Each structure stands twice: as structure tokens, then as C-alpha cells.
Swiss-Prot record:
<feature type="binding site">
    <location>
        <position position="153"/>
    </location>
    <ligand>
        <name>Zn(2+)</name>
    </ligand>
</feature>
<dbReference type="InterPro" id="IPR036869">
    <property type="entry name" value="J_dom_sf"/>
</dbReference>
<dbReference type="GO" id="GO:0046872">
    <property type="term" value="F:metal ion binding"/>
</dbReference>
<feature type="binding site">
    <location>
        <position position="182"/>
    </location>
    <ligand>
        <name>Zn(2+)</name>
    </ligand>
</feature>
<keyword id="KW-0862">Zinc</keyword>
<keyword id="KW-0408">Iron</keyword>
<protein>
    <recommendedName>
        <fullName>Diphthamide biosynthesis protein 4</fullName>
    </recommendedName>
</protein>
<dbReference type="Pfam" id="PF05207">
    <property type="entry name" value="Zn_ribbon_CSL"/>
</dbReference>
<dbReference type="InterPro" id="IPR007872">
    <property type="entry name" value="DPH_MB_dom"/>
</dbReference>
<feature type="domain" description="J">
    <location>
        <begin position="5"/>
        <end position="92"/>
    </location>
</feature>
<comment type="similarity">
    <text>Belongs to the DPH4 family.</text>
</comment>
<feature type="region of interest" description="Disordered">
    <location>
        <begin position="36"/>
        <end position="65"/>
    </location>
</feature>
<dbReference type="GO" id="GO:0005634">
    <property type="term" value="C:nucleus"/>
</dbReference>
<keyword id="KW-0479">Metal-binding</keyword>
<dbReference type="InterPro" id="IPR001623">
    <property type="entry name" value="DnaJ_domain"/>
</dbReference>
<feature type="compositionally biased region" description="Basic residues">
    <location>
        <begin position="55"/>
        <end position="64"/>
    </location>
</feature>
<dbReference type="InterPro" id="IPR036671">
    <property type="entry name" value="DPH_MB_sf"/>
</dbReference>
Length: 219
């Protein structure tokens, strides 16, 4: 049985010339939720769960072929990189699907310029730098809380995430980030704590209501 291509994994057409980083990222997110629907239901609030239920309407059947998270992540990191995608497309054109499988399984044997390995860590494994410290240090992304991790290419802050990055991918509970200096990617997993804002708002509303009733009694 031939191995699926990265395009098949993300349900993208290799002949589409107008694939953008945004459309590839959207396909990646869609693939994760399609093949691993638990990604959107295990960690998040009811509002996110509602959006997930809308993306999987009643009567929806799971895919016949289920891809692993590693397959989906590797497909995304390869196709979202112009250099790697060009090399991958060349491999698809010049060989059979079995050769594209070789591309997938032997990528670690290629030179460093073609490395697409993906390490998986928890957010707690990254160094947290509050925005106040970042601002005083003059870091470019200085107005946001930032998480850093060194890359094995030598860059001490090769991987960088902001709170905005985490919020953007909150429905997945993970985010893929590429090293600033090489093609190595990192998958960072995290759990989104349930927001207590609604409860606080309810308490405030109840408090306002009690105050209103008390004011009426005084009158």
C-alpha cells in the first residue's frame, strides 16, 4: 500500500498554484480536527466546543483513513516552507508514490538544510519572559509575554512564542513554531485553563442587582 502524500494528508491539491501560508495552515487545523476531534473537546470551554460541533455536523462520518498527528504536522511543516515544498514537489514529479514515501521516512538522513524533524515539548519546558522584562531588554516582540527555547542549530532563542500565538491556537491545544534560523520545527503542547470571566461577570451582575434592590428599599 502506497504512502499518502502530504497533499492528501491535508486534503490539498498539488496542482493548486495559489496555496498561501494561511490556506495551508487552515488545512492543517482542519486535518487535526477531522482526524483527531478530541483535540477540540478535551481542553477547552463550551464556546470552543460549540464551534467544534458546528464543524462536525450531525451525521458526519469519521474519515476512512485516519492520519496521525505526526503525519499531519510533518505535512504542514513541509508544505508551509517554500524551500521544502519545492523540493517535495520535485520528488513527487520525478518519482512514484513509493519514492515520496522514501522522502517522508528518510528525511532525517538528509543534510541539515533539509531537516524537518519535529520535537514535541510542553509549554512548561520553555523559558517564560514577562513582557515587562522583554520591554526593558529591547526585544522586538516586547509588548507581550514571550516563551523561548534554544534550538539545536545553536540559536539560544530559536523558538519564540507569544501569548497571542497560544490564544490563536487555543482550540488545538498545541502550536507549531519554526526556528528563526533553520528548518527545525517544534510542537508545543499546552492546556488552556477554563476562563472564569463568565462567573466573575455573573457575580458582578448579581452584586449590582442586590445593590439595586437595597437602594429601592432605602427609598
Amino acid at each position: 500500500m502506497s504512502q499518502p502524500t502530504f497533499y492528501e494528508i491535508l486534503s490539498l491539491s498539488p496542482t493548486t498554484s495559489d496555496l498561501t501560508p494561511a490556506s495551508i495552515k487552515q488545512a492543517y487545523r482542519r486535518a487535526l480536527l477531522t482526524h483527531h476531534p478530541d483535540k477540540s473537546s478535551s481542553n477547552f470551554s463550551s464556546s470552543t466546543s460549540n464551534s467544534h460541533s458546528n464543524s462536525h455536523p450531525k451525521g458526519h462520518h469519521p474519515p476512512k483513513t485516519r492520519y496521525t498527528i505526526d503525519q499531519i504536522s510533518l505535512a504542514y511543516t513541509t508544505l508551509s516552507s517554500p524551500t521544502l515544498r519545492t523540493q517535495y514537489d520535485a520528488a513527487l514529479r520525478s518519482s512514484s508514490s513509493s519514492s515520496s514515501s522514501c522522502f517522508t521516512t528518510t528525511r532525517k538522513e538528509e543534510d541539515d538544510d533539509f531537516q524537518t524533524g519535529i520535537d514535541t515539548i510542553d509549554l512548561d519546558d520553555m523559558v517564560f519572559v514577562p513582557h515587562e522584562t522583554s520591554s526593558s531588554a529591547g526585544i522586538s516582540r516586547n509588548e507581550k509575554d514571550t516563551w523561548y527555547r534554544p534550538c539545536r542549530c545553536g540559536n539560544e532563542r530559536g523558538f519564540a512564542l507569544t501569548e497571542e500565538d497560544l490564544e490563536e491556537n487555543a482550540d488545538l491545544g498545541e502550536v507549531l513554531v519554526q526556528c528563526a534560523d533553520c528548518t527545525i520545527w517544534l510542537r508545543v503542547c499546552y492546556v488552556v485553563a477554563e476562563d472564569d470571566e463568565e462567573e466573575e461577570e455573573e457575580k458582578e451582575e448579581n452584586g449590582d442587582g442586590d445593590g439595586y434592590e437595597e437602594e429601592k428599599r432605602k427609598r
